[in-house]
Every structure is written in structure tokens, then in C-alpha cells.
């Protein structure tokens, strides 16, 4: 209810001039609200069961960003500077070590595939994590890379049987929205 109220208030203040938007827009707006509620519920559950705390959103990795570029020396003496933006950075501090993970929000079905990394593909998240590890981040000491995760940000569509109970349906929804990636093995 609260999320819908916030969305509706934002919509009225910023996106309309008071006129009706039509049934199709109303439907899409309700779907957006449901998606936001699903994502917020997952975030609340995630942080209730984790030592990680979100510490940065849209973190800039750039020569003038909060974290410097990730630099790769080239054979000709030049330098390849990789820059970008991290959706979310989480930190868990334990025994003087700052465990850092980067999270990328995905509206599609992106899955982490180590084979792609092996062949030099889909390395963006790892490079961002390495930039934070190598260049430092705020006042965190003894940074240890803890992982990269893709987080689906969609309201999952699940196929159900007519007589399926709510618990089974919720389990299917959770399976479709589970974060995936690679994490440090404790």
C-alpha cells in the first residue's frame, strides 16, 4: 500500500497535468507498483538475513568518480582505462576485513556464466569489483572481494496448476527471482 501511495504521488506531481491517462496506462502503472513491491519485499528479506549492508548506489568508477578506473597496461605502453557505474555496492565488515560485493539489477533473465568470463565475455561486474578492490573505496580497510550478483527486478510470471497451493506458488516465484552470480566461499 505504501509503495503504491508513493508511486501515485510521484506520478501526479511529475508525470501528469491532471488529465486521465487511460485504462492501458492504469494497468501498466499497477503492474509497475506490483513489481516495485516484489523487489522491495525481496530486498527487505535479503538484508534481514545477511551481514551485508548497501553502502553505495550508482557508484561511479571513473578518473573523476568515487572509485578510480580499472587500468590495464597495453603492450605498446598505453593504458586501457575501464570506467562505468555499479548499481549497488554492499559491504560486510568482519574482524577488520571489509567484504565487498557488487550487485547489478536486471529486468531481464541475466544469468552469470563462468564460461563467458573464461572467454573474455561478460566481465563488467568482475572488473568493477576489481577496481574497488585495487583502488580502494571510501574509508574501508582490508577490502576483500566477496562476490558479484545479478538481482532480477521483475515481478515473476509463474505457471501454476489450478489446484496449486499458495506456498508452492511462492516457492516458484522465489526461484524465478533468486540472485545469481559468484561469491566468496567462506
Q: Where are the predicted features?
A:
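Structural signature of nuclease core domains in nucleic-acid processing machines
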Residues: 1-186
Amino acid at each position: 500500500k505504501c509503495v503504491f501511495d508513493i508511486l501515485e504521488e510521484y506520478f501526479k506531481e511529475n508525470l501528469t497535468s491532471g488529465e486521465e491517462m487511460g485504462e492501458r496506462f492504469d494497468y501498466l502503472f499497477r503492474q509497475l507498483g506490483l513489481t516495485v513491491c516484489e523487489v522491495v519485499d525481496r530486498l527487505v528479506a535479503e538484508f534481514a538475513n545477511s551481514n551485508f549492508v548497501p553502502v553505495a548506489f550508482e557508484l561511479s568508477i571513473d578518473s573523476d568518480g568515487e572509485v578510480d578506473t580499472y587500468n590495464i597496461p597495453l603492450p605498446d605502453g598505453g593504458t586501457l582505462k575501464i570506467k562505468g557505474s555499479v548499481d549497488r555496492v554492499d559491504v560486510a565488515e568482519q574482524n577488520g576485513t571489509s567484504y565487498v560485493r557488487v550487485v547489478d539489477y536486471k529486468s531481464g533473465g541475466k544469468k552469470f556464466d563462468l564460461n563467458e568470463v573464461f572467454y573474455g565475455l561478460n566481465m563488467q561486474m568482475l572488473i568493477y569489483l576489481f577496481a574497488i578492490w585495487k583502488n580502494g573505496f571510501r574509508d574501508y580497510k582490508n577490502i576483500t572481494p566477496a562476490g558479484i550478483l545479478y538481482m532480477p527486478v521483475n515481478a515473476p510470471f509463474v505457471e501454476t496448476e489450478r489446484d496449486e497451493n499458495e506456498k508452492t506458488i511462492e516457492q516458484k516465484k522465489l526461484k524465478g527471482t533468486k540472485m545469481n552470480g559468484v561469491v566468496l566461499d567462506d
